[in-house]
């Protein structure tokens, strides 16, 4: 039995958001195919995550150095540690997120800040940083209304590229990716584009 963490990085409803459609399709298909797995769903926007600020940074640093923390630093550190531990303990992690203003939503970025922890998800070495999460299976589900896979707009795509960079930094070198794009660029083909993409999501979920 695997422990699977599903991370939803969009506050909109399934009727309003393509990335949430991808998320829900993956969750439902995965549960049906793997009824005995432990599934944890994390809606980032429901968590009201505090930014990685000076208090949290001090708490994380001091804890790592076994120094005394203030009450505020300890509380902030515990918040980050809770999500970090949840991520580390999962055998598989699925992220669903949109491209917003060329990058990922701010709440998801804050969550990823929590996960980037030296000594836990990566280590510094003389040869450079080394990821420690190489055994973890990761899927990245990304929706973007325009076309960013190729052409001049490709260099502007910093959502999927960012997430690939982050999980790669953690040691996950081959995340499974599914992208639905172009549905806003060609509205008359939107339904076809979305449905085709959701079929791909189902296929990936069945074998994930």
From Swiss-Prot:
Please give the Gene Ontology molecular function terms for this protein: electron transfer activity; FMN binding; oxidoreductase activity, acting on NAD(P)H as acceptor; oxidoreductase activity, acting on NAD(P)H, quinone or similar compound as acceptor
* First-tier enzyme category under EC: oxidoreductase
Q: Which domain of life is it from?
A: Bacteria
For this protein, what does the record note about how its cofactor is bound? Binds 1 FMN per subunit.
Q: Work out whether the entry's keyword set contains Ubl conjugation.
A: no
UniProt keyword annotation of Acetylation present: no
Q: Which InterPro entries match?
A: Flavodoxin_fold, Flavoprotein-like_sf, FMN-dep_NADH:Q_OxRdtase_AzoR1, NADH:quinone_OxRdtase_FMN_depd
Cofactor or coenzyme needed = FMN
**Catalysed transformations (reactions):** 2 a quinone + NADH + H(+) = 2 a 1,4-benzosemiquinone + NAD(+); N,N-dimethyl-1,4-phenylenediamine + anthranilate + 2 NAD(+) = 2-(4-dimethylaminophenyl)diazenylbenzoate + 2 NADH + 2 H(+)
UniProt EC number? 1.6.5.-, 1.7.1.17
Task: Kindly state which keywords UniProt assigns to this record, in alphabetical order.
Answer: Flavoprotein, FMN, NAD, Oxidoreductase
Checking Pfam families in the record gives: Flavodoxin_2
What is its quaternary makeup? Homodimer.
HAMAP family to which the protein is assigned, alphabetical: Azoreductase_type1
Which family is this protein grouped under? Answer: Belongs to the azoreductase type 1 family.
NCBIfam families the UniProt entry points to: PRK13556.1 (NF010075)
Q: What does this protein do?
A: Quinone reductase that provides resistance to thiol-specific stress caused by electrophilic quinones. Also exhibits azoreductase activity. Catalyzes the reductive cleavage of the azo bond in aromatic azo compounds to the corresponding amines.
**Protein name in the entry:** FMN-dependent NADH:quinone oxidoreductase 2
What species is this protein from?
Halalkalibacterium halodurans (strain ATCC BAA-125 / DSM 18197 / FERM 7344 / JCM 9153 / C-125) (Bacillus halodurans)
């Amino acid at each position: 039995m695997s422990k699977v963490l599903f991370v939803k990085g969009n506050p909109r409803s399934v009727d309003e958001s393509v990335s949430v459609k991808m998320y829900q399709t993956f969750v439902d298909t995965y549960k049906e195919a793997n009824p005995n797995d432990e599934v944890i769903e994390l809606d980032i926007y429901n968590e009201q995550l505090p930014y990685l600020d000076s208090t949290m940074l001090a708490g994380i640093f001091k804890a790592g150095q076994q120094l005394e923390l203030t009450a505020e630093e300890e509380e902030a550190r515990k918040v980050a540690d809770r999500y970090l531990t949840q991520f580390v303990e999962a055998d598989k992690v699925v992220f669903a997120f949109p491209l917003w203003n060329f990058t990922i939503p701010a709440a998801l970025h804050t969550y990823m800040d929590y996960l980037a922890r030296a000594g836990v998800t990566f280590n510094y070495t003389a040869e450079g940083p080394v990821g420690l999460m190489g055994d973890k299976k990761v899927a990245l589900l990304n929706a973007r209304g325009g076309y960013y896979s190729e052409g001049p707009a490709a260099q502007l795509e910093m959502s999927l590229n960012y997430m690939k960079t982050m999980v790669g930094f953690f040691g996950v070198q081959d995340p499974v990716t599914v992208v639905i794009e172009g549905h806003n660029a060609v509205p008359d083909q939107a339904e076809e584009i979305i449905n085709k993409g959701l079929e791909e999501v189902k296929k990936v979920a069945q074998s994930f």
